[in-house]
Amino acid sequence: MNDNVPGAAPSYCMHNFKAAAAQNAERHEQGKAFVPPKYTFRGFEALPEDPANPDPDKFYGFVFQDTDFSKWIEAVGYSLTHHPDAELEATADAAIDIVCAAQLDNGYLDTYYILNGMDRHFTNLKDHHELYCFGHLVEGAVAYYEATGKRKLLDAACRFADYIDSRFGTEEGRLHGYPGHEIAEMALVKLAAVTGETRYSDLAEYFVWQRGQQPLYFCLLYTSPSPRDLS
């Protein structure tokens, strides 16, 4: 996770969370004067020109790079359940602090769009893995909570879930979409089980049953008179 493993390609995952956390701090300090980035990125992966000196304000890696943390923290949770390790837990807590500092006030937490431009979030559900990243974050948060009883990451996952729940559904004015890559559905069921909040399982049910409904959501996005940018 620290990008210092000899011979291994850097992940840039924690770099991205730190950059998003710094931007978030700047947003809070400047208030209404803060000018958010506008989405101009083109491509599925971004790498620094000089790997030894990445720009501290930019996103690097694949669009789903956040999941490196999520899968790691899930593994940490399972490990701590069977093999308590104070040092590993402290390392995980420090990483969680960084991740949670990147979360926007509305609950959104995906560094690809936070750093590249929130004006395009939820516009490419098919390819850009936002709900996939969300699902892995939830599964990691649940595993870590069940192992340690610590709620910080779980609460962040709930806030992200609440934001998604406010944006998606069959009602007019909501997005009628669903994940391009499934995992959010079963993650939401786990979140409902651990929190007792049935709205999360209801959201999972919506995603399951909305997929395949005619007209197909992704086809509409590709064929509409003003299709969204697919890059």
Roles of regions detected by a PLM:
Residues 118-124:
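Acidic/His metal-coordination segments adjacent to aromatic residues that form catalytic metal sites
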Residues 1-68, 93-113:
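Low-complexity, Ser/Thr/Pro/Gly-enriched N-terminal "stalk/linker" regions
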Residues 73, 89-103, 135-138, 142, ...:
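Hydrophobic core segments within long, regular secondary-structure runs in both alpha-
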Residues 222-231:
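Single conserved hydrophobic/aromatic residue that forms the stacking wall/gate
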